[in-house]
């Protein structure tokens, strides 16, 4: 059985009520059924700066690492410069082997509290950096930002904080990524 590692931030941790959950991990496992074992080593609140410190947690015998970092990096209140994000993501992909890079997740555009830290230009900038780095390393890039932007009744996909996803949002997220994982492992 193949082994998939989820390596990201609170989006991959199914963050809810102030704590991590197995919601996203379970959705990936359900979608991959008996095809692959899913292990989640994501760290809520982490940027690519912390991700570099967590690289040693990735099991040596993994078949694919799904990298989902960028939203915390892009935040103006606690993030990093785009150049540093690019440098860190390059280093991560150089060290982990076979991977898929997930683009940035769109915060709820109706939530002014969370959006004070983002904005479309900044999200697009960091998303483009992730896309560029993925191309440089010849790894698949899953651009989820446009899919989230097209949602109707978008607030139903988010918790009250405007950043973390509801059950509906988590299902949507995982359904955007599963085809890429299956393609990579076939």
Regions from the language model: what does each represent?
Residues 11-15, 42-46, 73-74, 108-109, ...:
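Short histidine/acidic/glycine/proline-rich micro-motifs that form metal-
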Residues 1-44, 50, 54-61:
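Serine-esterase "nucleophile elbow" of acetyl-processing enzymes
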Residues 52-186:
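Alpha-helical cap/lid subdomain in secreted, periplasmic
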């Amino acid at each position: 059985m193949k082994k998939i590692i989820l390596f990201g931030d609170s989006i991959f941790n199914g963050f809810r009520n102030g704590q991590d959950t197995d919601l996203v991990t379970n959705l990936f496992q359900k979608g991959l059924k008996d095809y692959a074992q899913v292990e989640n080593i994501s760290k809520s609140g982490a940027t690519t700066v912390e991700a570099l410190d967590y690289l040693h947690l990735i099991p040596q015998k993994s078949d694919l690492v799904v990298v989902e970092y960028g939203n915390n990096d892009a935040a103006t209140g606690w993030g990093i410069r785009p150049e540093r994000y690019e440098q860190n993501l390059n280093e991560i992909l150089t060290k982990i082997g076979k991977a898929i890079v997930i683009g940035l997740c769109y915060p709820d555009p109706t939530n002014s509290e969370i959006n004070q830290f983002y904005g479309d230009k900044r999200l697009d900038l960091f998303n483009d950096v992730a896309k560029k780095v993925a191309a440089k390393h010849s790894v698949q890039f899953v651009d989820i930002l446009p899919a989230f932007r097209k949602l109707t009744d978008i607030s139903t996909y988010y918790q009250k904080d405007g950043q973390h996803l509801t059950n509906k949002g988590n299902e949507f997220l995982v359904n955007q990524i599963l085809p890429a994982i299956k393609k990579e492992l076939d």
